[in-house]
Amino acid sequence: MPNLNSKHSVSEEFKNQALDLLNQSMIKINNCFDQLSEEQIWWSPVDSANSIGNLILHSCGNLRQWGITGIQKSQDTRQREAEFLADSRVSKTELLELCKVTIREFRHVVRSLSEAALLAERIIQNFRVTVLQAILHTTTHFAGHTHQIIMLTRRQLGKNYQFAWQPDEGQNELPI
């Protein structure tokens, strides 16, 4: 939640909220991974659908391309098609580590940005966007796939799914 008494600028608050969205996503992803086996991570409901493993690889690939290399104007080595290969058998531990490392790098990039830098233009995937747009795009993209991960987890576990957040727990942060 934003601190309404804070002396943060709008740009600082935007950066904080973008990073918080990723933190909330990771709470939910960790909750799902804690309930799933290695095999369930790579399950998909139909051959043409993505597995949770594919969604993690894809979300991290997008976060790196848009939020790290795109913002920094550094060499992009993303292999987008490889993120969707059904035979990509990366372990749960490796997938979570990939998320952790990618988010840590993204956090460093975002925190280093000045207000003026947020309005600088970049070309990412042949789209002309501001850095602010790139951050908004990639964090909401990550959160969207997080909800797909939750749906795939719930589909597999049914009534045995354990929520990461309960409304009666008295938590101060909004769940995504």
Question: Could you say what each language-model-derived stretch is?
Answer:
Residues 35, 58-61, 101:
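Residues within well-ordered alpha-helical secondary structure of globular protein domains
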